[in-house]
Amino acid sequence: MTTKKQPDSTIALNRKAGFDYFIEDQYEAGLVLEGWEVKSLRAGKINLSDSHVIIKYGEAFLLGAQIQPLPTASTHFIPDPVRTRKLLMNKKELNHLIGSVERQGYTIVPLSLYWKKNKIKIKIALAKGKKEHDKRDTIKDREWQRDRSRIMKKNT
């Protein structure tokens, strides 16, 4: 008996977050979406690179995420691709995020968007911003890892 291979549940990744920030803690949150947004996400029409999370009135909101509407969207409704979307989280997790952001100067950035049991979830991270020299160190390390693997491959 063969098992069915699960399709990749990842919708979008924010590769820029790992380069621009030191990732500390990761959390999973739900998203409040409209119908046209879910259809666009199924088609993979989202950009998370310039987005971030803010906390207002004890609730978390996703800002700057662009979900492009499909051309078949309704004509009597004007979709807003960059609207603010509410995140659904436990109160305990939310309180921890509020404390870290206000007291310790952390930023909350989205890492990925994915399907989980027919629901769309977003992985967010508590992060500290990198300075320019930290980014250069990251590039140097990445290039050294690439060169080292080439050398090892050539010698074997």
Swiss-Prot record:
Primary localisation category: cytoplasm
CDD domains in UniProt: SmpB
PROSITE patterns with a match to the protein in the record: SSRP
Region (Disordered), start-end ranges: 135-156
Composition bias, Basic and acidic residues: 135-150
SUPFAM superfamilies membership: Small protein B (SmpB)
GO molecular function: RNA binding
Keyword RNA-binding listed: yes
A GO term from the CC aspect: cytosol
Function, in words: Required for rescue of stalled ribosomes mediated by trans-translation. Binds to transfer-messenger RNA (tmRNA), required for stable association of tmRNA with ribosomes. tmRNA and SmpB together mimic tRNA shape, replacing the anticodon stem-loop with SmpB. tmRNA is encoded by the ssrA gene; the 2 termini fold to resemble tRNA(Ala) and it encodes a 'tag peptide', a short internal open reading frame. During trans-translation Ala-aminoacylated tmRNA acts like a tRNA, entering the A-site of stalled ribosomes, displacing the stalled mRNA.
One GO-annotated biological process of the protein: trans-translation
Superkingdom to which the source organism belongs: Bacteria
Name of the protein in question: SsrA-binding protein
Keyword set, alphabetical order: Cytoplasm, RNA-binding
Annotated localization: Cytoplasm
Residues that span the membrane, as ranges: none
Pfam families the UniProt entry points to: SmpB
Family in the record: Belongs to the SmpB family.
